[in-house]
UniProtKB/Swiss-Prot annotation:
Span of domain tr-type G: 8-282
An example Gene Ontology molecular-function term: translation elongation factor activity
Record-linked Gene3D superfamilies: 3.30.230.10, 3.30.70.240, Elongation Factor G (Translational Gtpase), domain 3, P-loop containing nucleotide triphosphate hydrolases, Translation factors
GO CC list: cytoplasm
Amino acids binding GTP: 17-24, 81-85, 135-138
The entry's keywords: Cytoplasm, Elongation factor, GTP-binding, Nucleotide-binding, Protein biosynthesis
Similarity comment: Belongs to the TRAFAC class translation factor GTPase superfamily. Classic translation factor GTPase family. EF-G/EF-2 subfamily.
Protein name, as recorded: Elongation factor G
């Protein structure tokens, strides 16, 4: 089947912003104007097409990235609407990885808000070309020029307006187009009747000033245009458009448009700018990958005739078709029913059906081409970040890295019958979301779930109830401590039982000594002359390892110990494997008590990014949490602080950081190593563990 839109007329864009800047409302208007929806949905009414999960409609926020496709003036635009809440940054991260460009929505009143900075840094990481749309020009306190200043200051970017608003708040009636130097005035509520007029007299001076800035920004990217500019020659309309496009794709300039999505003003002009200035799949560099053996770098340019290569960027469980895998095609074509290679896992997969997604509606298609974003049904082993490619031309595309969970809680089903259902539900949810982890605590036997924040885990528990009908109790966050010893000791233990008939007899002498942190457990057998028969050596080792699961201080796992078996004795009749296993366990416990046992706690590597004015408060806060500052650096208009802090002190840090930086600070953390717990805190941990208080 021939492609409907060639690559030059295809755009893959994301819509990103701070929570409540109006992303989803903007996407709804795009769908309305491009003819995908015949009635506009509103987020505050819970009827937005893109917010299709029940929790999204209730909370009025976007949680998952909904993908949809639209058509505008003979072009196809694939749009991904991403969440603005910090707990769901993984959705933004994986969307950016497969997009060619993005529209960042700013609130005309709030300007550059904290999540805007986070999202901007993520887009910088992937080198994504961007344009900005200043939304909510109709609300009280709207200030377009302040937003431009904040973008330059906080995001360190070259923000260049290509439109200026005519009026603001209640008087926002249209905009000046700085490319054509005309004005667009909106004459109806739906924003479909637009009159082109000369620039109003009171705006001629400011329009000329910003037009000059635009021409200068365009000239800087092109030597020929710079010569023309310096000689005072006029640019043609085509030269200006080509110059803006070139600078935008090179991420040297951020074109800025304005409007009010809720009042239906400015969205069509923003769509025109997407077509004019955002890259097509052929404008971006060829995607790089490596050969399966990892030796050779391979490039895959956007070309329908090239070998098929795609990246799976999202897994979703759909109530009707089961597991859906969203993927972006970088080169080649793919037919439904065909086989592909998952080169990341070296598994052959069959593409059952291919679906073009429109928020939560779907349309079955037979073939996808390079540059397309679609969803496949029938992939069994594919997860987020996997490469799908032609079996004869394998390639592994650069995958995505996801942050480690920063919060963990214990969870249990409310009923015994829910145990199995909960296991299935958690497995499916973990497949969908790479930042959500599940494991069983060996000490307590509890199921522990980890995620990016409390809202993240709230939504997971909520989805378990709605989608899988599992009710669960959720505990408070816990730290998993470890135990070890600080000095070498010798321990001897004899286990003897006589109760008529065959008795039990096991006797061993062991030496315990501490090992380097992270070195683990080592068992050495130094028995000579048959003091203990060979068949009883392994049971002694097994008994010791079993005893290591519950330490002598507070019942935590024991780590980093070397045990040497040096002597012992046995009884011809009464000795057994069980007797020696018990003797080994008892000797180990006895030795630990004498070997100066200590508690170890997990230490986290913490990265905090804050505006400079909050540095003192934040560093003081980290010190108060027993943190050690390891370094600082300026990064993208913010200060980045690196520290190591005990995990037990990090609970509640997200809230503390938010309040001490007015919501502008962000942090991430991952486990670094284990360290000895200070004596005063060790006593508290032991008493709370033994008394349960």
């Amino acid at each position: 089947m021939p492609r409907q839109f060639d690559l030059e007329h295809t755009r893959n864009i994301g819509i990103m912003a701070h929570i409540d800047a109006g992303k989803t409302t903007t996407t709804e208007r795009i769908l309305f104007y491009t003819g995908r929806v015949h009635k506009i949905g509103e987020t505050h009414e819970g009827s937005a097409t893109m917010d299709w999960m029940e929790q999204e409609q209730e909370r009025g926020i976007t949680i998952t990235s909904a993908a949809t496709t639209a058509q505008w003036k003979g072009n196809r635009i694939n749009i991904i609407d991403t969440p603005g809440h910090v707990d769901f940054t993984v959705e933004v991260e994986r969307s950016l990885r497969v997009l060619d460009g993005s529209v960042t929505v700013f609130c005309a009143k709030g300007g550059v808000e904290p999540q805007s900075e986070t999202v901007w840094r993520q887009a910088d990481k992937y080198g994504v070309p961007r344009m900005a749309y200043v939304n909510k020009m109709d609300i009280m306190g709207a200030d377009f020029y302040n937003v431009i200043a904040m973008m330059k200051d906080r995001l360190q970017c070259n923000a260049v307006p290509i439109q200026l608003p005519i009026g603001s708040e209640d008087c926002f009636v249209g905009m000046v187009d700085l490319v054509t130097m005309t004005s667009h005035i909106f004459k109806d509520d739906l924003g479909q009747v637009i009159e082109d007029q000369p620039i109003p007299d009171d705006m001629i001076e400011i329009s000329n000033k910003y037009r000059e800035q635009l021409l200068e920004a365009v000239a800087e990217q092109d030597e020929e245009l710079m010569m023309k500019y310096l000689e005072g020659e006029e640019f043609t309309l085509e030269e200006i458009k080509a110059g803006i496009r070139k600078a935008t794709i090179a991420v040297k300039m951020i074109p800025v448009t304005c409007g009010s999505s809720y009042k239906n003003k400015g969205v069509q002009q923003m769509l025109d700018a997407v077509i004019d200035f955002m890259p097509s799949p052929t404008d971006i560099p060829a995607i790089k990958g490596i050969s399966v053996d990892g030796d050779t770098e391979i490039e895959r340019p956007a070309d329908d005739n090239g070998p098929f290569a795609a990246l799976a960027f999202k897994i979703m469980t759909d109530p009707y078709v089961g597991k859906l895998c969203f993927f972006r095609v970088y080169s080649g074509t793919l037919n439904s029913g065909s086989y592909v290679l998952n080169s990341t896992k070296n598994k052959r997969e069959r593409i059952g059906r291919i679906l073009q997604m429109h928020a939560n509606h779907r349309e079955e298609i037979q073939v996808v081409h390079s540059g397309d974003i679609a969803a496949a049904v029938g992939l069994k082993d594919t997860t987020t970040g996997d490469t799908l490619c032609e079996e004869n031309n394998p390639v592994i595309l650069e995958s995505m890295e996801f942050p480690e969970p920063v919060i963990e809680v214990a969870i249990e089903p409310k009923t015994k019958a829910g145990q199995e259902k909960m296991g299935v539900a958690l497995q499916k949810l973990a497949e969908e979301d790479p930042t959500f982890r599940v494991h069983t605590d060996a000490e307590t036997g509890q199921t522990i779930i980890g995620g990016m924040g409390e809202l993240h885990l709230d939504i997971i528990v909520d989805r378990m109830l709605r989608e899988f009908k599992v009710e669960a109790n959720v505990g408070n966050p816990q730290v998993s401590y470890k135990e070890t010893i600080r000095k070498a000791v010798k321990s001897e233990m004899k286990y003897a039982r006589q109760s008529g008939g065959k008795g039990q007899y096991g006797h061993c002498v062991i030496e315990l000594e501490p090992r380097e942190p992270g070195a683990g457990y080592e068992f050495v057998n130094k028995i000579t002359g048959g003091a203990i028969p060979k068949e009883y050596i392994a049971p002694i080792d097994a008994g010791i390892q079993e005893a290591m699961n519950t330490g002598v201080l507070a019942g935590y796992n024991v780590v980093d110990i070397k045990v040497t078996l040096i002597d012992g004795s046995y009884h011809e009749v009464d000795s057994s494997e069980m007797a020696f296993k018990i003797a080994g366990s008892m000797a180990f416990k006895d030795g630990c008590r004498k070997a100066n046992p200590v508690l170890l706690e997990p230490i986290m590597k913490v990265d905090v990014s804050v505006p400079e004015e909050y540095m003192g408060d934040v560093m003081g806060g980290l010190n108060a949490r027993r943190g050690r500052i390891e370094g600082m650096e300026a990064r993208g208009g913010a200060q980045n602080i690196r520290a190591v802090v005990p995990l037990s002190e990090m609970f509640g840090y997200a809230t503390a950081l938010r309040s001490s930086t007015q919501g502008r600070g962000t942090f991430s953390m991952q486990t670094s190593h284990f360290e000895e717990v200070p004596k005063s805190i060790q006593e508290k941990v032991i008493s709370s563990r033994t008394t349960g208080v």
